[in-house]
Every structure is written in C-alpha cells, then in structure tokens.
Amino acid sequence: LIEQTRETLVDMGKLTPKWQQAALKPLASPKLLRVGSVALAIANKTGLLPDRLGLPDDLPIRQEPLVASGDDVWMFTGCVMDAWQRDVHQATQRVIEAAGFGVRPTSDAAPCCGALQSHAGMGSEARKLATKVMRSLGDKPILVNSAGCGAAMKDYGHLLGTDEARAFSARVFDVSEFLADHVDKFPTVKP
C-alpha cells in the first residue's frame, strides 16, 4: 500500500524529485555503478566528501571478481551490495560451497532487483528491473544475502501480479533460510 501510494505521488510530481530518480538510474547499469562507486571511494578516501553523507570509510576501489563454482544455486549479487560489499558475497559463497553446493553469482546478468526504485515510488522502473531479473535467472534456487533485495524479490508476485512472478518468488531464499534447510550437508566438525 505504501509503495503504491508513493508511486502515485511520484506520478503527480509530489515525491522523489527528478534528480533523485536520475541518481537511481546507475544502479541498473553495472558499469556506471562501478565507475561511480570507484569515484565515490576515491573522493571519500581523499576527504573530498563531507562526513554527513554517511558513506562507509572502507568503500572498495578495486574488487576481485566473483567466480562461479557450479550451478546448483544462484547467488543474487545485486547493485549496491555488489559494488560496496562484495566481501560479504565472497564469504557467503564460501559458506554455500562448504555445504556442497555449486554457486553461480548473478553479477551483470541480473544487476539490480528494483527494491530502491520501488521504495522511491518508481514502480514502472521497479517492474522493468524485476522482469529483467526473472528473465535472466534459470530455474535453480536463488539465494540472497541482502534483506532488502530478498524482500523485494519475494514480492515480485505481488509487484507484477503474474503466476510466473509468483513461481519465481517461491525460488528466492535468504541464504540463512536455505542453509538451515540443508544443515545436514555441512561437514561434521570434531571438537
């Protein structure tokens, strides 16, 4: 209800100014997001940005790519999470692999779930991104380590209102939720 109201207010020009809408566009473009993130990291590390922006001090300038180890599950990497916290994805992938699953990071194939656009009342853009994500990922389980992305993707059935979207959402799991259901796959550790 709140996001539908926001979308109506955006359409009326009463919420989310054009500059904010424009600022969200690079999230759907991995190359633009990487370039912008590196520029932000450099500006932040050199003290060019005010502290009130609240940017993390450890924004990465360079990151190692995520490499697929199989195709048992998708690991959704998203936009901001991948650009600013790829180390969390790397740790997540190691844990999933320890449970015996091959992992295929989504990376550029599905770069943005549309959660931020939806929250900003940009429903049309959120629906486009949701459709792109759904078309990009096969029929394997999709594991997510970002609560915002996971909640948005589990809501695609409601956002798009199709059986296809509802079936897709049923394949989305928080990584902890998925691993809890497969705890028997982990190797036994002796004290």
Model-flagged regions — what are they?
Residues I2-P191:
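Iron-sulfur cluster-binding electron-transfer modules in prokaryotic oxidoreductases
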